């Protein structure tokens, strides 16, 4: 069976938007209602969003990997790796940086990725070999001058010397959004070395960055592979070009 993933992704995003946006910035959104399969706290808005996702995707007969419930194995060739709401803390706190992320795999190979940024309703999508798009328009990574890069950098004390080698450092609190920003050239890189990144966070964004001309690796510079798991945690480097990748890898070698 073939699927129109673009239509499925956008329709799902629009239903999520309709159901969860009334909760934006409310105390109700941030209420703790349990723990997910990784042992992290599940917020009320996460539960609402995931219920919508499962209602839409499970009847398609595909496998689903989601942050809260874990893996729903339907025995399909297709696996949907999804984060219904990346940036749920931002959402609950009234910070307008959060997104729906959906990556499609046939076997272990990515075949489609979409990120829907609820505010301001930006729809990013990519297919292998077909490029990356924002609201239907082709996007490409930026080509920053050396030393003038803008980088999103997540750390717990490691590699702090990197801050001196780039011009701007940002931490937006929603890595799906940040990967989309790298793909469209608004950021030059995202670097997270907290051993905290889940496949559900980045399944769509990794494809988006690569199709926009960027590079995505692990912390050793090896090609980043999205695992079809809800519990795996890892590190990631996503950058606009090889020069910035080398700057980051050298900074990691220099750390005490």
From Swiss-Prot:
Keywords recorded for this protein, A-Z: Carbohydrate metabolism, Hydrolase, Magnesium, Metal-binding
EC assignment: 3.1.3.11, 3.1.3.25
Binding positions (Mg(2+) 2): 83, 86, 201
Binding locations of Mg(2+) 1: 67, 83, 85
Recorded catalytic activity of this chain's protein: beta-D-fructose 1,6-bisphosphate + H2O = beta-D-fructose 6-phosphate + phosphate; a myo-inositol phosphate + H2O = myo-inositol + phosphate
Effect of deleting the gene: Disruption of this gene does not lead to any detectable phenotypic changes regarding the growth under gluconeogenic conditions (medium supplemented with pyruvate) and glycolytic conditions (medium supplemented with soluble starch).
Molecular-function GO term, any one: fructose 1,6-bisphosphate 1-phosphatase activity
NCBIfam families xrefs: PRK12676.1
Function: Phosphatase with broad specificity; it can dephosphorylate fructose 1,6-bisphosphate (FBP) and inositol-1-phosphate (IMP). However, while possessing a high FBPase activity in vitro, does not participate in gluconeogenesis in vivo.
Protein name: Fructose-1,6-bisphosphatase/inositol-1-monophosphatase
Source organism per UniProt: Thermococcus kodakarensis (strain ATCC BAA-918 / JCM 12380 / KOD1) (Pyrococcus kodakaraensis (strain KOD1))
């Amino acid at each position: 069976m073939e699927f129109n993933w673009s239509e499925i992704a956008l329709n799902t995003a629009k239903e999520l938007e309709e159901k969860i946006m009334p909760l934006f910035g409310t105390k109700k959104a941030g209420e703790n209602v349990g723990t997910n399969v990784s042992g992290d706290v599940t917020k009320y808005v996460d539960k609402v969003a995931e219920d919508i996702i499962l209602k839409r995707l499970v009847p398609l007969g595909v496998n689903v990997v989601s942050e809260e419930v874990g893996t729903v194995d339907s025995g399909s060739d297709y696996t949907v790796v999804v984060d219904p709401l990346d940036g749920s803390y931002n959402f609950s706190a009234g910070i307008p940086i959060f997104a729906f992320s959906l990556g499609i795999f046939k076997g272990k190979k990515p075949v489609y990725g979409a990120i829907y940024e609820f505010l301001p309703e930006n729809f990013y999508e990519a297919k292998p070999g077909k490029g990356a798009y924002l609201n239907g328009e082709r996007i490409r990574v930026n080509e920053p001058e050396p030393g003038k890069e803008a980088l999103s950098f997540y750390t717990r004390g490691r590699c702090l010397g990197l801050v001196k080698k780039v011009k701007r450092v940002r931490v937006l609190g929603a890595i799906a959004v940040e990967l989309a920003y790298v793909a469209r050239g608004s950021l030059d890189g995202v670097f997270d070395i907290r051993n905290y990144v889940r496949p559900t966070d980045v399944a769509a964004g990794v494809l988006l960055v690569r199709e926009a001309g960027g590079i995505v690796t692990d912390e050793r510079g090896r090609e980043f592979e999205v695992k079809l798991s809800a519990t795996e945690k890892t590190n990631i480097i996503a950058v606009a070009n090889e020069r910035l990748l080398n700057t980051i890898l050298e900074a990691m070698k220099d750390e005490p």
